[in-house]
Regions:
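Charged, solvent-exposed interaction patches on well-folded alpha/beta domains
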Residues: 1-42, 51-52, 57, 65-90, ...
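Glycine-rich Rossmann NAD(P)(H)-binding loop
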Residues: 45
Length: 295
């Protein structure tokens, strides 16, 4: 009796395994049928990225099978997330990837590339003298950054000479892009790194725009290793503040100086304004020996 029951159980288990194996084989067979599979990969939207390289990467991701059974090139089951993730990982200048399969079995990869909004450059090995900052900050080690502060590609063809001009009223207009220096190690290729977190970068960019709206356009921000930031003005001189300082208050303090002094007037030779000391700002003019505290 027990033997018969055991044989029945073995038969049932065997039948289930045979059915499962049959289903697996059937699904595998169906997944490889041409009418279910991607035949070719097309890439659109690339500018600086080589489209053939993206095409090869996507084609490699749909090659093979899941668990040696289900085709990865199946139009329903192809690895969307992996393809998009691999493209963004291997090509930092890519901001977004959209995938779609057409009725003629073509996988279309639509790429959106990042747009240069700023430049990141390796910081000088010394603190630039404020009157000579454009010369001291000139460098060939510059990379494009997007509007979120991500460094995504080298500036092609070298860099133009850094010259502060009155036409640079905002970071993204005028003959040059606004430059950020420091924070990212320059000993290795910085592509893929961020200048700082998105919130802090947005605050820094907002300060640049705020200064421009107060008729104090700037061309570069240097973040020093000691935690001090210097915003270099087109008219000459710099605004000095601490990393992590309330940047809204920085703009307010500078605006107060504009109202109470003439240090920003045309013809003045400002060396720096230091707003690191709470409710007082210090400023120094070129060729003067000491700084002056605002009232």
């Amino acid at each position: 009796m027990h033997r018969r029951r055991r044989l029945v159980n073995i038969f049932k288990i065997g039948s289930v395994l045979i059915v499962l194996a049959g289903l697996g084989w059937g699904l595998s067979w169906l997944s490889y049928r041409p009418f279910w599979n991607i035949a070719t990969v097309d890439v659109h939207g690339t500018v600086s990225v080589a489209a053939p390289s993206v095409q090869v990467l996507a084609a490699n991701d749909i090659n093979g099978a899941y668990g040696w059974l289900i085709s990865k090139s199946n139009q329903i089951l192809y690895p969307r997330g992996k393809i998009a993730g691999d493209i963004e990982k291997n090509f930092p200048q890519v901001a977004a990837v959209q995938l779609a399969v057409s009725s003629d079995h073509v996988l279309t990869v639509n790429v959106t590339e990042r747009q240069p909004a700023y430049r990141w450059c390796a910081a000088p090995d010394f603190a630039p003298n404020f009157p000579d900052a454009p010369t001291a900050l000139a460098t060939n080690q510059c990379y494009f950054m997007d509007n979120l502060g991500l460094i995504f590609m080298p500036v092609p063809g070298g860099n133009e000479v850094l010259v502060a001009t009155s036409s640079m009223t905002t970071p993204t207009t005028g003959p040059q892009l606004f430059r950020f220096y420091g924070r990212v190690a320059s000993t290795s290729v910085p592509v893929g790194a961020s200048y700082t977190n998105k919130t802090d970068f947005a605050a820094l960019a907002q300060l640049v725009f705020k200064m421009a709206s107060q008729h104090l356009p700037s061309y570069a921000l240097v973040s020093r290793p000691d935690g001090v930031d210097e915003l270099f003005l087109n008219q000459g001189g710099a605004i000095i503040f601490d990393d992590g300082q309330d940047l809204t208050q920085v703009a307010t303090d500078v605006a107060a100086l504009q109202q109470s002094t003439t240090i920003f007037a045309n013809g003045s030779k400002l060396e720096y304004v230091d707003v690191r000391l709470g409710n007082k700002a210090f400023y120094k003019l070129v060729d003067t020996a000491t700084s002056t505290a605002s009232q």
